[in-house]
Amino acid sequence: DKDLIIKLHTGEGKTLVGLLLLQSLLNSKEGPCLYICPNKYLVKQVCSEADKFGIPFCIFDEDTGIPNDFLSASKILITHVQKVFNGRSVFGTGNGYVRTGAVLLDDSHACIDTIKSAFTISISKTANPETYSKILTLFADDMVEQGEGSRLDIQAGDYNTFMTVPYWNWDNKKTEMLKILSAAQEDSQIYYAWPLIRDQIRNYCCYISGTKIEIAPYNVNIRAFGSFSYAKHRILMSATTQDDSFFVKGLDFNPETVKNPLRNANQKWSGEKMLIIPSLVEESCDHDLIVTKFCKMSTSKFGMVALVPSTKSCKQYQNLGAITT
């Protein structure tokens, strides 16, 4: 299959599984294989793991381009998500992309925000006042029609007030908007996203607050990154995924692949987590009731941890027999 999702609990060897998968594909002559981590720190961990098990790999040197060992499909290239997913990617965008045999996203849930941010431009009023002011002026009349008071608060720099530019105003003024962004494209806040937005401006929306302006797509165009989108094999690995829907609408995965991830059949805990606010479920479940009930529960089959804001807040738990540190 082209796409594969692997869910393994933390500590079950996801990294080694991923490295072995890519090495197997290299041995099968599937083409260059790319291992993508959420950040630079985890790149070092994966490299250490590969070195420990004798799996050949290569990394980016600071002053060189894409390693020849990767392009020749001799070694796995290990890098971080920001290196691949940005408008100035060394792997190319649009039609000028580097062909790959397999791309693996490790801790894929942690990579999602980075991929989304690659398509987003955030213009700070403090760091880039000129561009911010031009955009604010461009849509000033449209904002007044929505809410004159809110528009005045934004002009005054209120952090908590924001407005969305109506899509019809955005579409009518997209040419003027492109001229503003093009003139400022060398700015660090615009530079990396500009190649992705310049020909897709119609598919973006704009949010304006008193401190910044954010321009984001309705949905990311993952096909702009051909090295990932058109790889022969795409593998996502994670202990848990909070936003599986993004794999379909964002990464263009088949829904059936997302519904049927590869799991360890003997695994008792999936790694998925649930956050519950008891008082929103049942009004009678106030703080004192929850603390009392939980402290009286048997912990022979599972552990229980309570995080409190201060030492003073520990006393209620101490009185009920909890161990505090």
PLM region descriptions:
Residues 62, 72-87, 108-109:
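P-loop NTPase motor core
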Residues 2-5, 9, 96-102, 107-321:
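Conserved coupling segment at the C-terminus of the helicase ATP-binding
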Residues 57-59, 258-259, 322-325:
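Short hydrophobic/aromatic-enriched beta-strand-loop microsegments
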Residues 85-86, 91-100:
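Phosphate-binding/switch loop-helix module in NTP-utilizing enzymes
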Residues 12-62, 83-86, 243, 305-315:
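Conserved Walker A/P-loop ATP-binding site and its immediately adjacent core
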